[in-house]
Structures are given as C-alpha cells and as structure tokens.
C-alpha cells in the first residue's frame, strides 16, 4: 500500500530536480518585461516557459508604461501584454551589463496592441549601439514583430536603442539576452535570424526549457513531399550547438526515395549573405545492408560530399564563409549518393543573414570615464543615453568627439563642457581618464577644494575653464605651461602667482607670537577649570554617580560643545531611558552600549563614554560629527546625544538582531542566515560604504569595517555602525592621507599598516575580509590553520578548485556555485595586498547586485510550482521557407 506514496515522492523529487536545473540554466539570462511597473512585483515566472521576467525600469531612464487592449491579452503571453513607449526623446536606450567578447542571442519584441486607443501602428528604428539593427514596421506586421540577432559585444556595456524616425511613437514589449557558447556560430560579424525550423509535422513550437539557450524553433513539414520518421530513444545533442533533443527526435526524408530533399526561398534583398546550420541525427534503426549517405548542395554546388548522419548523435554542418543566392531563389538540397540505399534526411535547420555594424562604439575607457563623472556629480541628463559620441546627431550634450572618416575607428572624447550644471564638491578624478581631452569647461558651478595636480599631467588639454567656482589653494605649477589657456577668475580663495607663499611668509612671525600667547592662556584656563571641578566634586555628597563617566576638560557653559540639530538629552534623561544603565547590549574600548527606550516605545541604543577610554572623547566627537552629516538607509542613524559637562552619550537607533558576526557563528542566539540573505546583507553593507566613499563631500573612510560593525534590524537589513575611527579626506582630490594606523587586526589593510597612508581602498580590503567571513564562516585569524589569515587560507584552497572546502558547511550546499565563485573572486580581488589592484566600492556593489539577482532567480524558480499551459502565439515576422 505504501508503493503509490513512494512513487509520488519520487516523482515530486524528480520535478524538484528538474525545476532546480531549469532555474540554474537561466541564471545568466536577461528577460525584461518592458513597461512592467515597479509598483507591481518586479519579477515573476512566466507559466508556459518557466522563464523569469523582471521589470525594465532600472535599465532605462525614459519612457512610459502601457498595456495592450484587454480584448487582445489572451492572444499573447504575459510578458508581451505590457510595453514601454517613448513619446519624448528621439533616441531612447537600454543600457545592459554584458561580458565583453562573449556571444549573445539578443531578442526584442514589439506589439502595438492599440495600447493608446488611436489605431496608429508605429514605424521606427532599432539600433544596437551606434548602428542600425532593423526598421520596425508595425503597420506591416500588425500582430507584432520580433528581431533576433547573434552578436558579440566589444565592451562590457550594451546599448539597445529605439529611434523615432517619423511622427509615430516607438515602443518595445520585451527584451531578452541569452549568452551562448563561444565555440558556436563562429563568424566574423553578427548574424540576423532568418528562420529556425525543425522538421516535424505534429509537435509545435519549441524554446526554453527544451532549448537551453532559449532559441525559438518552429515545426515545419511539407506533407505532400516528405515522409516523417521519429524515435522514442534519447538522442545525444552534446556538440557545440546543442539543438533541442525534441527537435532531433524527428526528421524528414523525401517521399520519393530517389528524389532530393529541397528547401528554397526568395531572398529579402539580392545581396543578402547567408550562413546555414544543418543539424543531422540518424534516428532510424538501420538494417544490416542499409546505408544513408548524401551530398549537401547550395545553389547546385556541393558543399559537403558523402555525409553519413551519426547514430542517435548529432552533427552540425555549416558553411565557413557567407554565401549568396545566384538566382531568384536560394536553393538548399540534400541528394543521396549512388552508394546509399536510403533517402537523405534532415532534422533541423537554422538560417541567418549577415548583418554589418560598420560604426565603432566610442572608446570604452572614455565611456567609463564619462559615466564615472556623471555618477560623481549625480548628473541626470535625459539625452545622456546610448553611445556618448555616435551617431553624431545623438551625441551627448556637452561632449565633442573626434569625427573619424574611418568609422571603424573608435571615437575619442575631445571636449567636455559641464558649465552651469550645478556641480558641487571637488573636481572629479575621473576627468583624468579622458586621455585625449583638449577642452574642459567646469565654469559657473559651485566646485570647492584645490585645483588637482592631475590636470597638469593631461598634456592634450589646451583650454581649461574653471571660472566662477569656489576653488581654493595654489595652482599646480604644471598649469602655467605655454600653450595652455587657463581661466580661473571668480574664485576669490584661489592663490595666483605665488601669492599664497608670500602671504604666509609675511604672517609667520605674528602667528608664532599669537600662537604662543594663546597656548599659555589655554593652559592657565585649563588649570583653573580643573581646580574648580575638583573643588565642586569634593563638596558633592551622595550625588548619583553614573556607572561610566569621565571628567572632560571642555567648555562648561550651558551650550553643547557639539553643534547639532539632533535632539539633545540631559544626563538624567539618559539614566531614565536606560533604566539606570540596566541592560548592556555591547561593549568596547569606548565603554558600553545600553538598551533604552524613549517615550516608552521607541527603542534606542545608548553608547556611554567610559572613564578608561584614553581616546574616548576624540572618537566620540568624530562619530557624532560624522553621523550628523551622513544620511543613508544602510548607515545607523543618530537619534540624539548627551553632552553635559563630564557626561557624554550617543543615542542612535536600536537594531534588535545584533551584529552579523553572531548570526554567522550562531552565538548569542543568532539565527541562521542562508546564502541569499548573506548576499543581500553584503550588498547593503557595500551600499552604505559606497555612500561614504562616493556620496559624501569630502569622502569618508570608515577604517573599521568588520562583521561586528554590521548591525541587523528586525528584517535582517544591514547597517554600518561604529564611526569612531572614521576619517574625512581634505577637499582636494587626494586619494590618500597619512594618519596614525588604527583598525582591527585581521581586517587591517596591510598596505595602510606599512605606509600609514589611508585611502578608500583600505576600507575595500576590510570589506573583502568581511565577504570571506560571510562565505566561509571561519575566523579571520586562526593559528590552528596552516594559513592563519583567512585570505591566505582561502587563496590556498582555491588552488584546489573545490569550493565545498571553503563554503560554510551550515549552508548545506544550498547555493548556486557560479554566484559563489563570483563572490569569491570579488572578495579575493578586494583583499589584494596592493590597493591599485582592488576595485572601488561602486564596482563591488554592482557585482554583488548581479550575484544577488542570480541567486534570487534560483530561489524563486525553486519555489515556483505553477502548472504549464499551452498558449498559441503567432508573429507576422515568422518566415517559413517553402519546400519542394
């Protein structure tokens, strides 16, 4: 009686495994439901294909959401019922992160569906980077159209653009990217899909999961001319192209055994060049004396002679160079040889046309530099989409580029004009990466800090306009060179012609005298204050003494010594909110952290300065000053403070789940955190750190990044804490400052330790160690290991290529290995001994975002158990060759 139950369990297990495999297979897919509002769930699983679609909102700045008419919705799958339309700009571009030099299948779908009620089907252009890909004519293809291309990007960013060419409004329904194996479809250029068919008269349309690359296969069969054969045995499809097994399980042979199998079609354009990929498998059980051998011909010429299909395997035959059609029709034939006893056979066929993309994209380094400048100044320019320089009529505002007569040569940025753009902060360091820049105009903004030395090193510059800002300090000597026009008027604090040195030398003697007198006065004042305080304390009997206090030598006036708009609490209020410091939730060199409540409901953490803390007031002051000027969802927020003579306390939001370390270790009742949540926590901590480095002026280095300083709220949202060691950079463009070494052993940047030169990359190193802790759940330093430091131990284990020895065993293998490898590589890159080889926090955050998206897809696919439905869908663009 138990057999049916066991059978059911086995079936469920099998389905779970299949679902898991499918989820992993589409980890690197990009499937965008264009126009899906962010107010709805931002991703979902399409029930027919099992593909995971997400909103396109984060990949494009422009456009509005639309939906096809309700009466048409049942005719299309869910991802194609919405659309994004573009009523404003002439060119609107998606920007997608891809792997440079990796081949992709790129597919775009367009369905008008009378979304606007105007019955006005649009015509517009589709561009890939700066080149025309296709003209989209929805007046001709009223039910929708699709464009599909095989393309190898030459940079890590891919722009897909919709360009308005008339009075109608461009739109897009879905955008899909599928990475392919680099050993398939080896051609010099890109390939535009003409048709992809498998020869079967009964089965229908195939795509993912039958095809692991999500290629679309239409069944095609000429009933009057062909005979179908099929097999129920499994066909091996393990060549570089991996056509679907279902497509190989059937084949067509000529009904007349002596006749050729012929497929012909008229070319769209007389000069079209074709690549054909024919997939063959012998699926018939041949008798002892049976032979199947045939020649493959193109327009009457033999391209493959005496071919014998492999038994239940697959061979893909393709032309090595593009071919054209000689007459009105292109003719593809399979003719059996005189030795063959059986007719020719064909299982599946792909036909592509060569598409030329003659215009090169802008130099990749220039593109990265301009985007970094855009990020540094938080610019939001609608026209800054797609390629910055080409086509020239769509070039970004404020940029002038080299106008090469040779369009195959990448353009370079020659001029950058950001005048009157509301810029604040320092002159962005990314400008120096525009190595061909001739003209720079940053005039009429509110830039501060010094004029950076790197401008003097940019030898191609002939004009620099910095007028109308708040720059200060001396000009670099290199900017006084002949041939350079430098405009700096309207910067009253800027020192010209050595005036800074002269002014300082004139004031040197008076300053020394004043400083000496002031020093004596301060010493006398301090002695008097100490004497008064000691007399006051000796006369106080029975006064309540706090458990942790320290006499401070600072202003005893009623006004606080720390300027703040946050709430100032009295010491008696601190005692009340902590119930006389009853519940201690943490402690360190500064003192203790106590739990408290305000108004009986709002929970807070109260950091109280310890009497034994030698650097206490300095670090306390630093933390308060920093928390007053930073505001980010992934940084602990300040509630208030107490600065009442010798009583100092900092009150900030209470995070009830404690720190990350205790959850990884399982100590103090910390709950287990799965791999997906670990990735999310790492990303949130990275975003907080990125804000300190890039979102603050001047930038801030935390100096003590570690798992115990990453706190978690009720939903396990991560926030960085403990800013007592943090340092701000001088406003100027320096990347390092010299300082006394401080931090936690094991997390401390070895380069910073040796040179005392602190930089943002010092935090990156510490964050890399945190990532290794998140991955391994191992102590940072463990003398019992052969390699005591965690980075050395992981590096040693990586040489063996087995991540199971590195991963936290508590995860029980519940993770996607590719995302783990990416995070491991990222962690080791962050922990590189040399700071120049480490990424910045923006790069770290972006990489973690991609890893988290992959992991979320895996988890969501594992949870999906929706039944599949068969939905028929047709596009007017599907081209079917006719056979004879």
Curated annotation (Swiss-Prot):
Any single GO CC term annotated in Swiss-Prot or TrEMBL for this entry: membrane
In which compartments does the protein localize? Membrane
Stretches assigned to the Extracellular side? 24-510
LRR repeats: which residues?
412-433, 436-457, 460-480
Listed Pfam families? LRR_8, Malectin_like, Pkinase
Q: Which domain of life is it from?
A: Eukaryota
- Residues bearing PTM Phosphotyrosine: 652, 752
- Catalytic residues, per the record, are 704
**Where in this protein does the record say Phosphoserine is found?**
738
Which sequence positions carry the modification called Phosphothreonine? Answer: 570, 739, 744
Catalyses: L-seryl-[protein] + ATP = O-phospho-L-seryl-[protein] + ADP + H(+); L-threonyl-[protein] + ATP = O-phospho-L-threonyl-[protein] + ADP + H(+)
| Record flagged with keyword Signal | yes
Q: What does this protein do?
A: Required for accurate photosynthesis.
Q: What is this protein called?
A: Probable LRR receptor-like serine/threonine-protein kinase PAM74
Q: What is the species of this protein?
A: Arabidopsis thaliana (Mouse-ear cress)
Gene this chain is encoded by = PAM74
């Amino acid at each position: 009686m138990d057999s049916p139950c066991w059978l059911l369990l086995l079936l469920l297990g099998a389905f779970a495994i299949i679902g898991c495999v499918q989820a992993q297979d589409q980890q690197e897919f990009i499937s965008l439901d264009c126009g899906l509002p962010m107010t709805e769930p931002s991703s979902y699983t399409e029930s027919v294909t099992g593909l995971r679609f997400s909103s396109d909102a984060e990949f494009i700045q422009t456009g509005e959401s639309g939906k096809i008419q309700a009466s048409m919705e049942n005719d299309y799958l869910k991802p194609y019922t919405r659309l994004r339309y573009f009523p404003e700009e002439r060119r609107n571009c998606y920007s997608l992160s891809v792997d440079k030099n990796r081949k992709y299948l790129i597919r775009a779908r367009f369905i008008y569906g009378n979304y606007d009620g105007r019955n006005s089907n649009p015509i517009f252009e589709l561009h890939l980077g700066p080149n025309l890909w296709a003209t989209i004519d929805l007046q001709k293809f009223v039910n929708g159209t699709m464009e599909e291309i095989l393309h190898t990007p030459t940079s890590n960013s891919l722009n897909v653009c919709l360009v308005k060419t008339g009075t109608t409004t461009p739109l897009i329904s879905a955008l899909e990217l599928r990475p392919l194996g680099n050993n398939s479809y080896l051609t010099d250029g890109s390939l535009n899909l003409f048709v992809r068919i498998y020869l079967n008269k009964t089965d229908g349309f195939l795509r993912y999961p039958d095809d692991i690359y999500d290629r679309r296969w239409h069944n095609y069969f000429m009933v009057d001319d062909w005979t179908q054969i099929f097999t129920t045995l499994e066909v091996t499809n393990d060549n570089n192209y991996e056509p679907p097994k279902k497509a190989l399980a059937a084949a067509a042979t000529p009904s007349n055994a002596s006749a050729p199998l012929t497929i012909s079609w008229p070319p769209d354009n007389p000069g079209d060049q074709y690549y054909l990929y024919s997939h063959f498998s012998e699926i018939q059980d041949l008798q002892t004396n049976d032979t199947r051998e045939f020649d493959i011909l193109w327009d009457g010429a033999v391209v493959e002679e005496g071919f014998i299909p492999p038994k239940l395997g697959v061979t893909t035959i393709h032309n090595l160079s593009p071919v054209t059609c000689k007459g009105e029709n292109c003719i593809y034939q399979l003719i059996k040889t005189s030795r063959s006893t059986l007719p020719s056979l064909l299982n599946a066929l792909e036909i592509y046309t060569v598409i030329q993309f003659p215009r090169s994209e802008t130099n990749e380094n220039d593109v990265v530099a301009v985007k970094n400048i855009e990020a540094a100044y938080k610019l939001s320019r609608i026209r800054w989409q797609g390629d910055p320089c080409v086509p020239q009529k769509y070039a970004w505002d404020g940029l002038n580029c080299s106008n090469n007569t040779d369009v195959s040569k990448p353009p370079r940025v020659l001029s950058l004009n950001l005048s009157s753009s509301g810029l604040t902060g320092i002159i962005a360091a990314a400008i120096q990466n525009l190595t061909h820049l001739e003209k720079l105009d940053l005039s009429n903004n509110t830039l501060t800090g010094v004029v950076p030395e790197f401008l003097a090193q940019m030898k191609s510059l002939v004009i620099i306009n910095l007028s109308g800002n708040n720059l200060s300090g001396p000009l670099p000597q290199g900017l006084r060179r002949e041939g350079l026009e430098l405009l700096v008027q309207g910067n009253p604090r800027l020192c010209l012609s050595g005036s800074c040195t002269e002014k300082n030398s004139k004031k040197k003697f008076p300053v020394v005298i004043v400083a000496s007198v002031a020093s004596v006065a301060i010493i006398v004042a301090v002695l008097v204050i100490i004497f008064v305080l000691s007399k006051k304390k000796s006369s106080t009997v029975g006064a309540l003494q706090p458990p942790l206090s320290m006499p401070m030598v600072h202003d005893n006036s009623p006004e606080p010594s720390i300027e703040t708009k946050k709430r100032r609490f009295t010491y008696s209020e601190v005692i009340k909110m902590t119930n006389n410091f009853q519940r201690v939730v943490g402690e360190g060199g500064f003192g203790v952290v106590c739990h408290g409540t305000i108004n009986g409901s709002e929970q807070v953490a109260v950091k109280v300065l310890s009497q034994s803390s030698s650097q206490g007031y300095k670090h306390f002051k630093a933390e308060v000053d920093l928390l007053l000027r930073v505001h980010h969802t992934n940084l602990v927020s300040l509630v208030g403070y107490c600065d009442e003579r010798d009583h100092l306390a900092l009150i900030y939001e209470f995070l009830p789940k404690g720190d990350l370390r205790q959850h990884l270790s399982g100590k103090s009742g910390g709950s287990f955190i799965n791999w997906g949540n670990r990735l999310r926590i790492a990303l949130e901590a990275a975003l907080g750190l990125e804000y300190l480095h890039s979102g603050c002026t001047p930038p801030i280095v935390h100096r003590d990044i570690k798992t115990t300083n990453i706190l978690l709220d009720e939903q396990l949202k991560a926030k960085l804490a403990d800013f007592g060691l943090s340092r701000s950079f001088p406003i100027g463009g320096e990347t390092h400052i010299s300082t006394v070494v401080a931090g936690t052993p094991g997390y401390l940047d070895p380069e910073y330790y040796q040179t005392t030169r602190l930089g943002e990359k010092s935090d990156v190193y510490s964050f890399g160690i945190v990532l290794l802790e998140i991955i391994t759940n191992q102590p940072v330093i463990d003398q019992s290991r052969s390699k005591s430091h965690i980075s050395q131990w992981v590096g040693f284990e990586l040489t063996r290529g087995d991540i199971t020895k590195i991963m936290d065993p508590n995860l029980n293998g519940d993770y996607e290995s590719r995302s783990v490898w990416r995070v491991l590589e990222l962690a080791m890159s962050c922990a590189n001994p040399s700071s120049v080889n480490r990424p910045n926090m923006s790069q770290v955050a972006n990489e973690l975002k991609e890893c988290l998206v992959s992991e979320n897809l895996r988890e969501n696919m594992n949870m999906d158990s929706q039944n599949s439905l068969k939905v028929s869908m047709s596009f007017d663009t599907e081209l079917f060759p006719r056979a004879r």
